[in-house]
A protein has these predicted regions:
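N-terminal catalytic or cofactor-binding beta/alpha core of small enzyme domains
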Residues: 1-146, 151-266
């Protein structure tokens, strides 16, 4: 079985959801602390929100099957920090929860050989497929658009104070896409009052946005980090916390964002 699913669309847009996977291989699961098996740091139910939009708009969609505890697809292959000097965060092969508690049982952490093997088995196939799909879209349409979707708990006191804005749009401070795309999406977010929002705030875009956002080559990428309160009941067990009523308010705005990207012309 493939470590990811790619559905090819008919428009120049690819939606990537790199942190929705939940599978953990049995041989790895037995080395993790019991708490890890609940996959609390997953971007829960995000595929349920985005897949209907991708189908409706004819966009391509790529999603992993495996948990970010196996490999973090939004980190560089050499595991260099995305925000040098910043505290917190997790690496290519995480060994700690967001809360900085250990993921692994004592003495069971992966060594360099295992990290390299996971990179080869999980990270590389996903990125080869992602890059290949962007190349296909560019060849077919003259340009390619990448929307990297994420979600996060609204409050993570060990990483930041208070509550995050509901919608956090990142364009690597404008480097990952044409200025007009940032302007169009920023204006759309600023023009609504249902969700708090910020552009290039705490979340400016991870490896995927920064690496594949190459405006000079006709390849434009943005990241949306959405608080889970937008579509989930955060007081519940996350595996069953999807809220149809909340999601019904968030989905139309995300659809408008995707349409704004598609309406842009180089």
């Amino acid at each position: 079985m493939s470590v990811f699913e790619l559905r090819q669309g008919r428009v120049p847009l690819l939606i990537s959801l790199p942190h929705v996977g939940t599978q953990i291989p049995a041989e790895l699961a037995e080395r993790l602390v019991p708490r890890a098996l609940a996959s609390e740091d997953t971007d829960w139910h995000l595929e349920r929100l985005y897949r209907p939009l991708a189908d409706k708009l004819g966009a391509s969609l790529i999603v992993p099957r495996y948990s970010r505890y196996v490999i973090d697809l939004n980190r560089p292959p050499d595991d260099q920090p995305l925000y040098p000097g910043a505290s917190g965060g997790t690496g290519l092969v995480p060994t700690r929860f967001f809360s900085d508690d250990p993921l692994y049982r004592d003495g069971a952490e992966p060594d360099a050989t295992e990290v390299a093997a996971r990179r080869e088995a999980y990270w590389l196939p996903y990125h080869q497929a992602l890059a290949g799909e962007l190349e296909r879209l560019r060849a077919a349409h003259g340009h390619a658009l990448l929307f990297d979707g994420h979600s996060i708990r609204s409050e993570l006191p060990w990483l930041f104070e208070g509550q995050l804005p509901a919608l956090n749009l990142g364009t690597a401070d404008g480097a990952s896409c044409a200025p007009a795309i940032t302007e169009r999406l920023g204006a759309l977010l600023a023009g609504q009052t249902r969700f708090s929002q910020v552009v290039n705030g705490r979340f400016k875009g991870g490896y995927i946005t920064r690496h594949y956002g190459r405006p000079a080559e006709g390849q434009h990428a943005v990241q949306l980090e959405m608080c889970q309160r937008c579509y989930m009941d955060e007081a519940c067990d996350p595996s069953g916390a999807y809220d149809e009523a909340l999601a019904g308010q968030a989905a139309p705005l995300i659809e408008k964002m995707l349409k704004e990207m598609l309406a842009w012309q180089p």
